Regions:
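Glycine-/small-residue-enriched transmembrane alpha-helix faces in small-molecule transporters
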Residues: 1-35, 144-182, 318-320
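Hydrophobic alpha-helical transmembrane segments of multi-pass integral membrane proteins
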Residues: 4-6, 32-48, 70, 124-131, ...
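Helix-helix packing/entry segments at the starts of transmembrane helices
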Residues: 12, 36, 76, 80, ...
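Specific transmembrane alpha-helical segments of multi-pass solute transporters/efflux pumps
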Residues: 17-18, 50-99, 135, 240-258
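Hydrophobic/aromatic residues within transmembrane alpha-helices
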Residues: 25, 33, 86, 112-117, ...
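C-terminal-most transmembrane helix of multi-pass membrane proteins
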Residues: 38, 138, 264, 268-320
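Hydrophobic transmembrane alpha-helices of multi-pass small-molecule transport proteins
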Residues: 45, 49, 118-143, 147-148, ...
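C-terminal transmembrane-helix exit sites in multi-pass transporters
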Residues: 48-52, 102-127, 134, 272-291
Length: 320
C-alpha cells in the first residue's frame, strides 16, 4: 500500500504544477497557455498510441466520438482555461483551494451512482467546507496582490473566484461522465480512453490556436511585446509530459494499490503541492486566513471521505 501512497503523492506533485504555470508565464494569456499545453499533450498522446492508433479509432462509434469530444472539452480544454483565469485573477491559493473540493463535489453529485450518504449525513462536513471557503474569500478581498493576482481589482478577483468555481463544476461533471462512460464501454481501457481524449484535446487546441493566431495577425498593427516563445513551449511540453502523462500514469498505479476511500484523500496532495509552489514563488508564509482555509477545507473533505469509508465498512460487514 505504501507504494500506492507514494505514487499518489507524486501524481499530486505533478498535478499541482498546473496552478503555478500561469504565474511563471505572466506574459501569456490563459487561452495561449491552454492551447500550448494541449497541443503538446495531443502530440505526446498520438506518439504513445501510434502503433495501435488506427485500429483503436476504427473501433469507435459515433457516440464514442461525441463522448471523447465533450470530455476533452470539459476535463481538459475548458477546465484548464478556467483554472488559468482563476489563478491570474484570484491567485494560486484561492484557485487551488476551491478546486481542492473535487473529492467532495464528485461524491455529492455522484451519490446516485455510488449509493453514497444522503446530504443530511454530510451536513457537518459541508459546514466546515463552507467556513473554509469563507476564510479564503475574506483573505482574497482583504489583501492586494499574491501569487498570480498581479494587483487585480475587486471585480477581477470576483471573476477569478467565479472561474475557479466553474472549473470545479466542469471537472466534477467530467469525472462523473467519464466514470459512467467507462462502465458502459468495456471495449476501451481507461488508459486508451485517456490518450484518446488527450488526442482530441490536442485537435481542439490546434483549431483554437489557429483562430487565435489569425486574429493576432489581423491586429498586427498593434505593438506586441517580445515574449519568450522557447520558454513557453518548453514549459507547455513539461506540463503535458509531467501533469498529463506521468501524473495520470502514477495516479492509475495508485488507484490499483490503495483502497478507494484512501484515493479520495490522496487527491488532496494536488492542492497541497499547488499551495506549496505558490507560496514558494511568492516567497512568503500563508496568512492566518489562508491557514484557516487550508485546515478547514482539508478537514471537511477528509471528514466526508471518512464518513463514506465507515458506511462502506458497515455495508461490507452486513453482506458478510
Amino acid at each position: 500500500m505504501w507504494r500506492g501512497i507514494v505514487c499518489g503523492l507524486l501524481a499530486g506533485a505533478f498535478w499541482g504544477a498546473v496552478f503555478i504555470v500561469p504565474v511563471l508565464l505572466p506574459d501569456f494569456s490563459p487561452l495561449e497557455l491552454m492551447v500550448g499545453r494541449y497541443i503538446c499533450y495531443g502530440v505526446l498522446a498520438a506518439a504513445l498510441m501510434l502503433p495501435r492508433l488506427l485500429p483503436l479509432l476504427r473501433r469507435l462509434r459515433r457516440d464514442d466520438c461525441l463522448a471523447m469530444l465533450r470530455q476533452a472539452l470539459s476535463g481538459n480544454v475548458v477546465y484548464y482555461l478556467l483554472l488559468a483565469y482563476g489563478v491570474k485573477l484570484a491567485g494560486v491559493a484561492a484557485t487551488s483551494l476551491i478546486i481542492g473540493l473535487l473529492p467532495l463535489s464528485v461524491t455529492i453529485f455522484g451519490r446516485k451512482d455510488h449509493g453514497a450518504l444522503p446530504l443530511r449525513r454530510l451536513a457537518l462536513p459541508l459546514l466546515v467546507v463552507a467556513m473554509g471557503i469563507a476564510c479564503i474569500n475574506l483573505d482574497i478581498f482583504s489583501h492586494a496582490g499574491g501569487a498570480g493576482t498581479d494587483g487585480a481589482s475587486l471585480a477581477q478577483k470576483l471573476l477569478g473566484v467565479l472561474c475557479a468555481v466553474c472549473a470545479l463544476a466542469c471537472w466534477t461533471w467530467y469525472a462523473l461522465d467519464n466514470a459512467r462512460f467507462l462502465k458502459c464501454h468495456a471495449q476501451v481501457s481507461a488508459v486508451e480512453w485517456a490518450m484518446l481524449y488527450g488526442l482530441a484535446s490536442g485537435v481542439i487546441a490546434l483549431i483554437v490556436g489557429a483562430v487565435v493566431l489569425a486574429l493576432q495577425q489581423a491586429g498586427a498593427a498593434d505593438a506586441v511585446p517580445t515574449r519568450s516563445w522557447s520558454q513557453f513551449w518548453l514549459v507547455c511540453l513539461l506540463l503535458a509530459l509531467g501533469a498529463s502523462v506521468v501524473g495520470n500514469y502514477l495516479w492509475n498505479l495508485a488507484s490499483r494499490l490503495v483502497p478507494v476511500t484512501l484515493s479520495g484523500q490522496l487527491i488532496l496532495s494536488e492542492t497541497l503541492f499547488a499551495l506549496l509552489y505558490g507560496f514558494l514563488y511568492a516567497q512568503r508564509m500563508p496568512r492566518p486566513l489562508e491557514w484557516g482555509a487550508m485546515v478547514l477545507l482539508a478537514a471537511g473533505v477528509l471528514w466526508s471521505v471518512h464518513a463514506h469509508a465507515r458506511e462502506e465498512s458497515a455495508g461490507g460487514e452486513e453482506l458478510a
